[in-house]
Amino acid sequence: MATRGRHRSRTSGTSSEPMTLRAPPDERDLDSLRSFGVVNLDKPPGPSAHQVAAWIRDATGQDRVAHGGTLDPKVTGCLPVLLGDAARMAQVFDNAVKEYVTVLELHDQAPADIADIVAEFETDIYQKPPRKSAVKRQLRSRRIHSLDILEQGDRRLLLRVRCASGTYIRKLCHDIGLAAGTGAHMGDLRRTATGTFDDGSLSTMHDLVDALAFAADGDEAQLREIIQPAERALSHLPRVTIAPSAAREVAEGAPVYAPGVIETGPAEVGDATPEIDSQVVSVTPDGAAVCLGTLVSDPDADSGLVVELDRMLV
């Protein structure tokens, strides 16, 4: 970790009243959580991810929400929903590693070497988006980080897939069936993790509605467990801590300059470190997110641009 002993910053604006920055993540009131929070939702089967996000928007009284990675209507599981200003950070899920549990339905009895066949797909694979996809149908590479058989029957496998964002699990199941010589299709599919969110902290729509009702009666405990500070979605990114005066300049649209940098450090979750051209989150000394940006130069320099602004979060 690089630490700086000086907290100089450029003067900002002409107002005599400095703007108020967000409170530390663990000290926010419920209104602040609702306007800059994230719900790790257990998406039910049936509605689309967009429909579910709209329900949460209406239930929480926010003008805007976003979700962290779409799920088809029949797919269940981990769907982080970003509330209010947190919707600006939805891009952090674009390249997040995803994990799924799926049923592989073989069209004939599994061959004796099915485990070896499955293991061959734990690599970079090539896929073309399906005809109904919203993206251009061109061949592209996707990494399968791990592929484990959790259960096995004569014609059915329960698989856990950890993969790059944008992997088509249905196509993966089809290709495994071809390699096995039996043919196969995907059965049930559930997402168990996306980025730093997993199925260990999921909440249902019913949980959220009940918690909102309790909060309206003065009991905030359940809602505070469900709506997490938005910074939770950024814990996999390297951090650049900046002075409050520099944070106020960012709020006015300025990037982060070297004199305003206090220190840099690795991600709270994972092993990402602040490298040139890497995505970083700039935070205040008490941990409140200020902006997403790209580290463009040495943060220990005496002058110059350090973090180019991608998304303002204040």
Swiss-Prot record:
Query: In the Enzyme Commission scheme, what number(s) does this protein have?
Result: 5.4.99.25
Q: Which residues form the PUA domain?
A: 237-314
Q: What are the boundaries of the signal sequence?
A: none
Q: Name one Pfam family in it.
A: TruB_C_2
The reply to whether tRNA processing figures as a keyword in the UniProt entry is yes
Q: Name one GO molecular function term.
A: tRNA pseudouridine(55) synthase activity
Q: Would I find Ubl conjugation among this entry's keywords?
A: no
* Residues covered by region (Disordered): 1-30
Q: Which reaction does it catalyse?
A: uridine(55) in tRNA = pseudouridine(55) in tRNA
In terms of superkingdom, the source organism counts as Archaea
Q: What does this protein do?
A: Could be responsible for synthesis of pseudouridine from uracil-55 in the psi GC loop of transfer RNAs.
The entry assigns this protein to a family as follows: Belongs to the pseudouridine synthase TruB family. Type 2 subfamily.
The cross-references to PANTHER family, in alphabetical order and at most eight, read: CENTROMERE/MICROTUBULE BINDING PROTEIN CBF5, H_ACA RIBONUCLEOPROTEIN COMPLEX SUBUNIT DKC1
Q: What is this protein called?
A: Probable tRNA pseudouridine synthase B
> From which lineage does this chain's organism come?
Archaea, Methanobacteriati, Methanobacteriota, Stenosarchaea group, Halobacteria
Q: Which gene encodes it?
A: truB
